[in-house]
Amino acid sequence: AEDLHSGSRAAIVGGITSVFEMPNTNPPTTNFEEFQKKISLGKRMYCNHAFYFGATAENYQLLEKLKDLNGCCGIKLFAGSSTGNLLVDKEDDIEKVFKHASKVVAVHSEDEEILKLRKKLIEKGNVKTHPIWRNEEVAISSTRKIVKIAKRLNKKAHILHVTTKEEVDFLSQNKGNITFEITPQHLTMYAPDCYDKLGSYAQMNPPIRDKSHYERLWYAVRNNYNDT
């Protein structure tokens, strides 16, 4: 199994010099005790590193105390369900996270309510249904909501792994305290080809989408719309 030691070695071999480690681990990084354990374990890493502090529906008061926390690169918010159990999907709880945040909030932006409604579209054994279930509306609906909350509370939000042309257009028009990321896997593959070639190895959240989204992501990169 990958750990901080082996993962950082792989990063260096791949030409990556710095990593921000996510909090959806076992145990999750959602309190100061677990965060300090990560700092100690980080001494075995080969590359530059920092750690996200995971937001939950219950730990929002801790988020006020992160401003000067050494080694903390930000707060991670899972607005849609993914790996781990750090889901914060109720709008009131999302608002509490932003209200108490003392660092940038990096968001896995998918609308959990829409995900639940569309779950019936999953066909067991057919990975091509993954982007149908987690469709474009799942992403853009959540991203609009996150931006609205962040702007109203004058907080910084960083939308992670953007996958849709709708999000690119929307986020490009709402910069300032709002930044966004496009990841290599969404710039090197598109559906349905990736699922034909790689099967479930191409399955991720949010999913790899069709070529029209792939092309808009590249358009954003070439025109410096995305921030990371």
Predicted regions and their residues:
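Short catalytic-loop micro-motif centered on adjacent basic/acidic residues
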Residues: F20-E21, A50-F53, K156-H161
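Acidic, glycine-rich active-site loops and adjacent beta-strand->loop/helix elements
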Residues: N24-P28, F53-A57, S81
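Metal-associated gating/positioning segment near the N- to mid-region
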Residues: A1-R44
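Histidine/acidic residue-rich metal-binding segments in metalloenzymes
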Residues: Q61-T228
